[in-house]
Amino acid sequence: MTNSKNRFGNKFIGAHVSAAGGVDNAPLRAREIGANAFALFTKNQRQWVAKPLEEKTISAFKANCALLGFSPQQILPHDSYLINLGAPEAEKLEKSRLAFIDEMERCQLLGLNLLNFHPGSHLEKISEKACLSLIAESINLAHQAVPDVVAVIENTAGQGSNLGWRFEHLAEIIEQVEDKSRVGVCLDTCHTFAAGYDLRTPEACETTFAEFERVVGMHYLRAMHINDSKVKLASKVDRHHALGKGEIGWDCFEYIAKDSRFDSIPLILETIEPELWPQEIEQLRKYHLSSIA
C-alpha cells in the first residue's frame, strides 16, 4: 500500500500512535486508523534513559514505513516530557541537553528528520529572557552534536512557568538559533487557543495565522497538533478535547484542512478519544479533498 495523491490529497493527517512493543509497530497502527502521517515516542517519554534501539527494530521500522508509504516528512517524533531545555539549575539543564541529543540521535538512526519538543520552563527562578536564551543554546548544542535533524518547537498553553505560549517566545528562540534551516515550529491548536489566540471562526483563524506570519513566519511551520480545547479562550490551561466537542469547534479544523499553507506537514491528532481518530481523520480528509476537487 503506497501513499497516493488521489487518496490523500496534499495533507498529511494522522495521530500520535503507540510504539508499544517496538517503534516498528507505530506505522502499522497509524495505517490501521487511516492515517498518512503519525507521531510517536522513540522511547518511554517518562524516563530519562532508554536502552539503545536495536538494529532489527530500526530495520523493521524503516521497512514498515516504506511498505506503507510513510516518508520522513510525514512522521513527527516527540521527545520525553522530562526534558527542560531552559532549566534554571545547571544539573537539570545538562541532563536535559544530553537526553535531547539522545532523542535526536534516535531520530537519525530511524531515518527521521523532525523532533518535536516543548521548549522549556523557567520555574520562576530565572527571567523569561534568560530561559529563552538557554533553550536556543540547547538547540545549538544539539545541532552541533547531531546532523540533519530539525528541532521543532511546540507552542504551549502558558500553563505554569512554561514558555512558548506567545508567538514572540518562539521568534526569540529562533532568532538565537544558528542554523535556521534546522529549527521549526509545531502549532498545537488547543495550546494556541488556551494561550489567547482565537481560532473559533474562519475570520479568527485568518487573524491568528496572520499574527504567526508577522511574528514568526509561516515558513517555520513544520507541523501541527490538531486538538479541540476543553477550556475557554486564554485560560492558560492545557486540556485537549475531541474535534468539535470543545470550545474551538469544527470551523477551525475545516479551515486548516482546506488551506494550502498547511499542506505537506504532519497534522497530528492528540485528541482524548482515540476510538474517534479514524472518524476525525476521515472528516479532515473530506474537508481537504473537497477543496481540491
UniProtKB/Swiss-Prot annotation:
GO terms for molecular function: deoxyribonuclease IV (phage-T4-induced) activity; DNA binding; DNA-(apurinic or apyrimidinic site) endonuclease activity; phosphoric diester hydrolase activity; zinc ion binding. Its cofactor is Zn(2+). The keyword Nuclease applies. The keyword Nuclease applies. Endonuclease IV plays a role in DNA repair. It cleaves phosphodiester bonds at apurinic or apyrimidinic (AP) sites, generating a 3'-hydroxyl group and a 5'-terminal sugar phosphate. Keywords: DNA damage, DNA repair, Endonuclease, Hydrolase, Metal-binding, Nuclease, Zinc. Zn(2+) 3 binds at residues 191, 238, 240. Belongs to the AP endonuclease 2 family. This is Probable endonuclease 4. Its EC number is 3.1.21.2. It catalyses: Endonucleolytic cleavage to 5'-phosphooligonucleotide end-products. It comes from Vibrio vulnificus (strain CMCP6). Binds 3 Zn(2+) ions.
